[in-house]
Amino acid sequence: MAIYSNAQPNLVYLKFNGEVVQEIKDFTKTHPYLIGQIRIDKNSLDFPDIQHGEQPVIHIGVVNLSDRPYEPVLMHLPPYLQTKVEPNVLQKGEKGVITLTLNSERLTGLGLTQTSVYLSRFSGDKVGDENEIPVSAILLPDFSGMTEVEKANAPAISLSTKEVDMSAILAKKSKARQDITITNTGRSPLQINKLQVFHPAVGVNLKKSVLQPGESTRLRVTVVKKNIGKKRRHLRLLMITNDPMQPKVEINIKAKQ
């Protein structure tokens, strides 16, 4: 390297000695989930709550750790999901992004929709537990057209608890259950339009789905220990109601074995 200046001498040569090495990249923190020789930054996809007509987006960061060019592909896509990959092919050590767009108009109904997509690790890959990525979306009713008078006279849901801990019981028994009281504290009939579970280990029984003002009913929650397994799904319940202040009610369940 030559350096010219207005000093004396006005020309100086610099020599550098060293060894050129390839940059060492550690993706374990930015992309903590390993599927085959592919690292990703998300192993489940929970879309934000949506209303009819909205199209939320989720991004999955992908890194190719294999020695061959890799084309990221999500298999078993449902009709309400669309994907875009940039770049289409990843060389060794290269990062990319899979963009998923949810079309809410193609969801079948209110409440929770669950499915699984599968990340192809190589051309011709098959689906299995190792490359499964659970997907969930919740479609809510739209109360934006209600007047202030209608809101003032609307139903209102109240629960005795939204947190259920069955860990102590499941430590000794194979099944646990707990009752939750639901009350309509509003001024018009409360409708529980949907009651859904996120996990196959959870069961529910609701005595009444329509409550008059001041009326209560019982919701029984059951968890079967052997069905908890290793599924990456939330232990919680979801209710969709006609309460404009609480169209979605979630009940979280703890069930450490």
Residue ranges and their predicted role:
Residues 2, 11-13, 52-59, 105-118, ...:
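Short, solvent-exposed loop/turn segments enriched in Ser/Thr/Gly
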Residues 67-95, 187-216:
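Surface-exposed binding patches on compact interaction domains or structured appendages
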